[in-house]
A protein has these predicted regions:
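Outer-membrane beta-barrel "beta-signal"
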Residues: 406, 419-433
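Detector for outer-membrane/organellar transmembrane beta-barrel domains
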Residues: 77-79, 243, 274-296, 300-376
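Transmembrane beta-strand segments of Gram-negative outer membrane beta-barrel proteins
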Residues: 27-46, 77-85, 371
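Transmembrane beta-strands of outer-membrane beta-barrel pores
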Residues: 38-44, 70, 87-93, 124-126, ...
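Hydrophobic, lipid-facing positions within transmembrane beta-strands of outer-membrane proteins
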Residues: 58-64, 103-106, 158-162, 221-225, ...
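Repeated loop/turn-to-beta-strand initiation elements of outer-membrane beta-barrel proteins
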Residues: 72-83, 116-118, 170-173, 233-236, ...
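Outer membrane beta-barrel
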Residues: 67-194, 232, 407-409
Length: 433
């Protein structure tokens, strides 16, 4: 999403920031922190379909972060105003060009009333109970970063939004308005090959898909709401989203590869809390993803509505060892109509998709070494995605991470198996200041 579309908001925030900083006493000046990092990711099963062979990540990155609490103006101090700015400068050797990412976050937050918090600007939005699984969290994600081995921080993309949180003893309410659409960053064949139904095979640079985003106008503003309350250590959430699919799951023109982001309403709920007797934390989340343009599966060019369910459990054990399990189901709601409207050559999806996940975490050396294995497995597609990693916090400033993204499966159109030609091992070295 081009930042120019929300130029007025960002300029206003920047103007307040500059005024606050310029007029602040030297002792109250905001402090700069962040990190510099170098990353390398080598392919271990290269299908030679992407634009570069042998690797899919080689980059140097610098992050700059400023947080400031202005108090020069009485009203800013009274409202506990916070100005936050975070940006990355990236030298992406895979793309052979430096990239100024612009602000990853740039917002102003304040509390005008004792029960109301406001945040306006570019910000990371997230909710839900899943571990790498998102049902009611319909905010944008960067799955390319996820697959090539960037830090988990880069999985979630910022949104240009206004957020209002209202709190009371009875419950709390989050209201979010997003006037500028931000899509998921999905594999497009340049860096990561993928299964393209237009070719009926795994493709790379030869893919010629084009994505059409909803234009920025009042009628296209996305609205999110979350009502939540904690009762006896159990958090109950209800969620609503009115917006668009963040991945291009609709065709405007199938012959020319013109895809778009159909309208979507999401209704969901979740609960999370401790498990009696057995110990640990359990969660349950469900959501109805109502595809507004599929006409009860009569439109074969648009994603059908689905009901989704997630059950999770995690527990810590002695010696800094933790286990997490999840079971995830996606059920198509109008499957008979969906099948009846398929054409010859169309790929028929399963009515029910199932996926299991496992997370194992063990800390060593006074918790300075963290070893993790995360596994996705689908008995429907019979594919596996392994995410092993080992991180070593050598000092307060230096951190080294080595890991991998390993994809296994025989079906080219499987959710994870389609990336088997992109399996990689990576290394990240970071210095924080």
């Amino acid at each position: 999403m081009n930042a120019n579309k929300i130029l007025i908001i960002l300029v206003a925030i920047a103007a307040i920031s500059i005024y606050a900083v310029v007029t602040a006493p030297a002792a109250d000046m905001p402090k700069l922190n962040g990190f510099v990092e170098t990353d390398i990711g080598l392919k271990v099963n290269d299908d030679k379909l992407a634009s570069k062979n042998g690797y899919n990540m080689a980059e140097q990155r610098a992050e700059f972060k400023l947080r400031y609490f202005p108090d020069k103006l009485a009203i800013l101090k009274q409202w506990n105003t916070e100005i936050f700015f975070k940006t990355d400068v990236l030298m992406d050797e895979y793309m052979e060009q430096p990239k100024w990412w612009g602000p990853r976050e740039l917002y102003i937050a304040f509390t005008p009333l004792s029960f109301a918090d406001v945040k306006i600007g570019e910000q990371i939005l997230t909710w839900g109970t899943g571990d790498y699984i998102f049902i009611n969290d319909q905010f944008p994600k960067d799955y390319t970063s996820f697959i090539i081995g960037r830090d988990d921080e880069y999985l979630k993309l910022p949104s240009y939004a206004g957020r209002l949180t209202l709190s009371s003893k009875l419950a709390s309410l989050d209201l979010v308005a997003i006037p500028a659409f931000t899509p998921n960053n999905v594999p497009n064949g340049n860096r990561i090959s993928f299964f393209d139904p237009l070719f009926d095979r795994i493709v790379g640079t030869q893919s010629n898909r084009y994505f059409v985003e909803p234009p920025m106008k009042i009628d296209n503003t996305e609205v999110e709401a979350r009502l939540y309350r904690t009762i006896n250590s159990y958090q109950w959430d209800t969620n609503y989203n009115h917006g668009y699919y963040k991945s291009p799951v609709g065709y405007k023109n199938q012959q020319t590869g013109l895809l778009y982001y159909p309208e979507l309403d999401t209704y969901g709920a979740s609960i999370q809390g401790p498990v009696p007797i057995a110990g640990g934390i359990a969660n349950f989340e469900t959501g109805l993803l109502d595809s507004k343009e599929d006409d009860y599966a009569k439109n074969r060019l648009v994603q059908d509505s689905t009901a989704q369910y997630l059950v999770g459990y995690k527990r810590g054990f002695k010696n800094d060892f933790e286990v997490g399990l999840q079971y995830y189901i996606i059920q198509m709601l109008h499957y008979t109509a969906y099948k009846n409207n398929l054409l010859a050559g169309d790929i028929q999806n399963d009515k029910v998709y199932q996926q299991y996940t496992l997370r194992l975490t063990k800390l060593f050396a006074n918790q300075t070494v963290n070893t993790t294995l995360f596994v996705f497995y689908s008995p429907v597609d019979n594919d596996v995605y392994l995410r092993p990693s080992l991180s070593w916090k050598a000092t307060d400033a230096w951190n080294l991470v080595v890991g991998g993204n390993i994809f296994l499966g025989n079906q080219d159109n499987a959710a994870w198996g389609q990336y088997k030609g992109d399996s990689n091992i990576y290394c990240r070295l970071r210095y924080s200041y």
